[in-house]
Amino acid sequence: MRTLWIMAVLLVGVEGHLLQFRKMIKKMTGKEPIVSYAFYGCYCGKGGRGKPKDATDRCCFVHDCCYEKVTGCDPKWDYYTYSSENGDIVCGGDNPCTKEVCECDKAAAICFRDNLKTYKKRYMTFPDIFCTDPTEKC
């Protein structure tokens, strides 16, 4: 299921905030997000279940939880504004909902950056059929 969602995004030509999130991740980590994070662990990419495999996967778990709290807009598709000032991401705009989405994405990108040293290539294309531990609650 995660694979189909990612492929659909790639084929459609990413619109709205998914492209913005990709740019944030690239800026913070230097990694290509689709290759490095789209299929990482049990939570990066579409959906998630089980227990996060490591700190990077936990970044995705927390990001999913952050999205669950957003109301009034579609976190995956609605466009938001942000800028980069002195290496920091600054979320802007007048819409509180899309600003909240931006803050979720910003926190995840920073989390990825802060956990680069523990990033494990073995989780880069981790099959979700191995995510069998009980699912944690947000």
UniProtKB/Swiss-Prot annotation:
Residues annotated as the enzyme's active site: H63, D105
Gene Ontology molecular functions: calcium ion binding; calcium-dependent phospholipase A2 activity; phospholipid binding; toxin activity
Species whose genome carries this gene: Protobothrops flavoviridis (Habu)
UniProt subcellular location: Secreted
Any single biological process term in GO: negative regulation of T cell proliferation
Binding site for Ca(2+): Y43, G45, G47, D64
PANTHER family attached to this UniProt entry: PHOSPHOLIPASE A2 FAMILY MEMBER, PHOSPHOLIPASE A2, MEMBRANE ASSOCIATED
Cofactor: Ca(2+)
UniProt keyword annotation of Lipid metabolism present: yes
Main location class: secreted
Family to which this protein belongs: Belongs to the phospholipase A2 family. Group II subfamily. D49 sub-subfamily.
Catalytic activity, EC: 3.1.1.4
Keyword Nucleotide-binding part of the UniProt annotation: no
Reactions listed under catalytic activity: a 1,2-diacyl-sn-glycero-3-phosphocholine + H2O = a 1-acyl-sn-glycero-3-phosphocholine + a fatty acid + H(+)
Record protein name field: Basic phospholipase A2 PL-X'
Class of enzymatic activity (EC top level): hydrolase
